[in-house]
Amino acid sequence: MVYGKLSTRGSEEVFEWNHSYSKIYQPKVKYNPKGVFMYFENYNVEVRDRVKCISAIEVGVPVSTQWDASGYFYPIQIAQFGLSHFSKNLTDAPPRLVILEDGFNYLADWVSAEKSHFKRRKDGSYRVLEFSVKDRRMPGVVTRVDKLHPSLLILQCALRMVGNGSLVIAVEDKDRGFTYSLIYTCSQELLTVNGNDVIYGIGDCPDQWHYLTRDLAIDLLKGHVVSGRGKKISRTRLRLLSLTLKGEGQITNLTLRSSAHESQFRSAAEWLVKHQDVVTGGWPIPVRRRFGPGIQELNPGWISAMGQGQAMSLLVRAYNRTGDEAYLRAALNAVKPFQVASAEGGVLARFMNMYIWYEEYPTTPPSFVLNGFIYSLIGLYDLLTVADQFQSVRRIFDAGMASLKKLLPLYDTGSGSTYDLRHVMLGSAPNIARWDYHSTHVNQLLLLSTIDKDPILKTTAQRWMNYMKGKKAPHN
């Protein structure tokens, strides 16, 4: 099978073809842990089918349905969410934004119905809009936003509810021909749909401030998926109509933006700090993982070297960005599982009892997944750039790089690469990496070749790129 597209070269129209559907990103400069992470500025974690929604309860991070349809917090997915938004924050244009209400300088045009009222006042260090709508059947306190630029689909605010209040955004979906209500309310229910109402719980509301950053297009999309209305949405076909306050509470710093990458990457970094097991240094994965015949399944609570590595990459960037030592402490603590055998709850394995390996899946017998191992090495390298005085981190990184260089040939099929080494460990057929994983291998090796000049990294990457063009290793 070949893949391709029509393009123009000079005055001629040509068909550019490839044996692969994946893209290679040639690094132009040496990899920098203060900059974009690989090519993650092109990632959009939120739209993935395996993301149930972005939690409004747990500081705005994705909830995964991979391996468990009920949904759970998957550290790898959360780290990738943070890394993608960190990278977009560096590459995207500055956002459009409109401050609607801050209680002082920016005052929205609110309208209150019968038995509803609002007023502005100072509350501690905040200037706030205080509202009271005691009869929830009434329209509430409303402001229109239908004249604003259509790209302003990110909502941010500080919201404090007294009792069971809610913030309601009316959104017109022109493709479906309906208006939907996005409702953020005091509840522990993650996401529910009732007709055209898409309801997100923001947790219990014991008269405390909630700081929301919500991508309204994504929130509506996930509601459509739950209700069976389809898995696609066009941001350009959405129009915000109004914002409504119900119940009793206060709101301030109410803003609509075209993007909020800084807040989103920080949400992921803060989640990692908050949910790290301080004893083990890991982010336990709370689901059972079945890996395949001949390999024992992983029980809930396993730790992934890939998760540890990508978390370190995000935490180092958050530390570089903010100077907050909490991020650095968490990144350093994340090294602990690299020193504990995978059979004992860590991620450390050995190939043929000789070569160190850090397991994406700490299976018995070891599985030696390539892409997850390399992501762990990138995370260790990132950490070394801010903590090179820690010799244990240096030893762990150097041992991993030495193993990678020795074992890379075992992943080469002559026409592609393998995902892992089960063909060696089990004597089974090789687990051939599909093209998107193969291209990930290539992109990872190209990145490493900018920080380590050993020719095996660059030459292997080049050979594996040629496989994507249909070239194969010669036969005898």
What is each model feature region?
Residues 74-89, 302-319, 367-384, 433-449:
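Well-ordered alpha-helical segments within folded domains of soluble proteins
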Residues 111-141, 185-187, 192:
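Short carbohydrate-recognition loop motifs
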Residues 132-138, 148-222, 248-250:
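Extracellular ligand-binding interfaces
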Residues 44-69, 281-302, 348-371, 413-440:
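Carbohydrate-binding/catalytic loop surfaces
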Residues 88-98, 222-224, 257-267, 318-333, ...:
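Structural helix-adjacent loops and short alpha-helical linkers that scaffold large soluble proteins
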Residues 238-263, 285:
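Exposed low-complexity, polar/acidic, P/S/T/G-rich flexible segments that act as propeptides
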